[in-house]
C-alpha cells in the first residue's frame, strides 16, 4: 500500500500542496500538460526553488496574466464563479476519471461549508477566492499530482490554524476563516502562537476530502520526501508543507496491516415519490447507475393523505452528483431533491480468481487487520457459469467459495 503523509507543521494551502508533491517527484511538466485539458485560460505556472529557514522547498505560483497586464498583483484578482460552473468545467474536460473525482470532492467539500455559512443551497454557492483561477488550478493540480503518484492511503498530522484576522471578499474575518473552520469539523486541529492564517479553505478542503486518517508518521519504508513553500516568511519556523511518501510496513512478518479500513466521502440524494408506475421506477434505477451512482435503492414509505410511496436514495461520488441530480429531476415526478454528504468506513478489499469445475470464478475478499474475513464469489461469473453448464446457481457459488477458502489456507 502506497502511503502519503502530510506533515502540516506550518499549515497547508493549495499552492503548498502542489509544490510539495512536485518536490517529492511529480514532474511539473505532467501537471502543466494535464491542466491544459481544462477550459481555463489567462494564467501561467511558475515553479522555483526557495529556502525557508534553512529548508529548500519548491514554490508554486499561478500567475494571472490578465492581472499582470493591468498592473495588479495576481493575488488581488478574484474571478467570481458558481460551484456548478466549476464542476461542469471539470466534468467536460478530458482529465482522467480519478482526477475529476478528486477535484470534485475537494470543491464539493468547500461548497458544502460555504453553503452552510451563507445559508444557501450548495448549487447556489458563489465562490470568490476559491472561484479564482489560481485556486481552481491549485485544486485540480493537486488532484493530478495525487493521481500521478498512485497514492492508496493518506494520513495527516493535526492541522494548525493560526490566529488573527484576514481580509477577504466579504470584509475582515477572524483566523481561522469561517469556511476553514466549518470544513475542518471532525478533523484534529491545533492552535499556536503564530498571528497568521496557516491553513486556507483550499488547504482545509484538500485535507477533509482526501485524508483517510490522522496521527503521527506511520511505520513505512520511505521512498520520497517533498517540501512545498508558502509565500509568507514565518518568524520562528520554516513556512513549508512536508510530504512523506512510502510503502506500508508491518511490525513483524506475521503482524497485522497498519491500516484496517479507510474513510470515503459519499454524497446522498433523496426524494419521495408516490405517483410513478413501477416500470418508470425501474428505468430510473438503471439510468442512475449509468450516470455513475454507487448505489440506488427504494424504501417503502407512507406519505401525506395516506398514500403509499417510495423513498428514492442515491449514493454517489462528488464527480457524479450533478449528473445524478439532473437525471432525477428530469426522469422522476419530484419537485426537489434533498442532498447530504456522509463519510463511510470501508474495509480493504481485493479480487482473486479461483479455478472450479465450471471455469474460473472471481471472488471478492474483505480484509481486516491484514486477514481475509469474508469471501464473496462474483454474481455475474457464477450466473454465467451456471447458465453455460446448466447447473444450479448455488452449486457454482458453493464450489467457488470452497476453492477460495482453500486458497487462503494454502490447501
Curated annotation (Swiss-Prot):
One of its GO terms (molecular function) is nickel cation binding. Its EC number is 4.99.1.12. It catalyses: Ni(II)-pyridinium-3,5-bisthiocarboxylate mononucleotide = pyridinium-3,5-bisthiocarboxylate mononucleotide + Ni(2+). It comes from the Bacteria. Gene3D superfamilies: mk0293 like domain (3.10.20.300), Transcriptional regulatory protein pf0864 domain like (3.30.70.1380). Coiled coil: none annotated. GO terms for biological process: protein maturation. It holds the Pfam family Ni_insertion. Belongs to the LarC family. Involved in the biosynthesis of a nickel-pincer cofactor ((SCS)Ni(II) pincer complex). Binds Ni(2+), and functions in nickel delivery to pyridinium-3,5-bisthiocarboxylic acid mononucleotide (P2TMN), to form the mature cofactor. Is thus probably required for the activation of nickel-pincer cofactor-dependent enzymes. This is Pyridinium-3,5-bisthiocarboxylic acid mononucleotide nickel insertion protein. The gene is larC.
